[in-house]
Amino acid sequence: MTVGKSSKMLQHIDYRMRCILQDGRIFIGTFKAFDKHMNLILCDCDEFRKIKPKNAKQPEREEKRVLGLVLLRGENLVSMTVEGPPPKDTGIARVPLAGAAGGPGVGRAAGRGVPAGVPIPQAPAGLAGPVRGVGGPSQQVMTPQGRGTVAAAAVAATASIAGAPTQYPPGRGTAPTPVGRATPPPGIMAPPPGMRPPMGPPIGLPPTRGTPIGMPPPGMRPPPPGIRGPPPPGMRPPRP
C-alpha cells in the first residue's frame, strides 16, 4: 500500500490512540502500523469494557485488562482518537555517532604477521644455532650461483681444506709419524697413501730364521686347509 507523507495516519504513528469497537470495548495503546483495510497494530495496549449489573439499582462498572501487543480488525473499528503524545525513549542503548568523543584508547585493525618496523628478536649467543660456515660448507658454496661457479667454488673449498698447512709447536719442524705406520728403512720405498703394506714381517726386519717359505710369521693364524698362504716377500704371486 502506497501512502503519502501528508497522510494523517502516518502523522499519528507512535501516539497513544483510543480505539472504540462496535461492541463498546475501548482499546488504548501505542499506534505502530496500519494497512488499507484499517487493520491496526497497537503495543502496550489496555482493554476497557463496561459490565452491566444484574440489578437495575446497581451502577455499571468498568473493567480493565492488560493485553500488550494487539491486532485490531478494521471491520470492527468505529472511531479512533488521540489519547496522548508519543512516550519518551528511556533506557534504550543507542549506537554512538562517528563524530562523538571517544575514550583515551586508540582503535586499530588487527594485523597479521610481524609489522615492518618491528625488529625480529634473536636468540642469545649461547643458545643460537651454528653459524653458517662453521662445521659445514663455507658461505660461498651455500650461496646460489651458476652451475659452473658452484662446482668451482666447491672444488676450491675442498682444496683449501685439504691443503691447509698444519701449525706445529716451536722446536718441531716436521709432522709426527702417523700412529700404526712404521718408517721404512733406507733404500725401501714406502707404499703410496691409501694402500695396505705387503703381508709378511714388518718393514725393515728380515724374515726370522727357521720360518719356512710361504708360512705366516709368528703371531699370525695360518690359512685354512686347501688355501695357499701369501707369497714370500719379493716374489710375485702365480697367475691363475
From Swiss-Prot:
Signal peptide: none annotated. Gene3D superfamilies: 2.30.30.100. Sequence repeats lie at residues 175-181, 191-196, 216-221, 222-228, 230-236. One of its GO terms (molecular function) is snRNP binding. Keywords: Methylation, Nucleus, Repeat, Ribonucleoprotein, RNA-binding. The modification Dimethylated arginine is found at residues 108, 112. One of its GO terms (cellular component) is catalytic step 2 spliceosome. Residues 4-86 form the Sm domain. It is found in: Nucleus. Its main location: nucleus. The modification Asymmetric dimethylarginine is found at residues 108, 112. The modification Omega-N-methylarginine is found at residues 108, 112, 147, 172. Coiled coil: none annotated. Pfam families: LSM (PF01423). The keyword Nucleus applies. Residues 175-236 are annotated as: Repeat-rich region. Residues 165-240 are annotated as: Disordered. Belongs to the snRNP SmB/SmN family. Interacts with TDRD3. Encoded on a bicistronic transcript that code for two proteins, SNRPN and SNURF. May be involved in tissue-specific alternative RNA processing events. This is Small nuclear ribonucleoprotein-associated protein N.
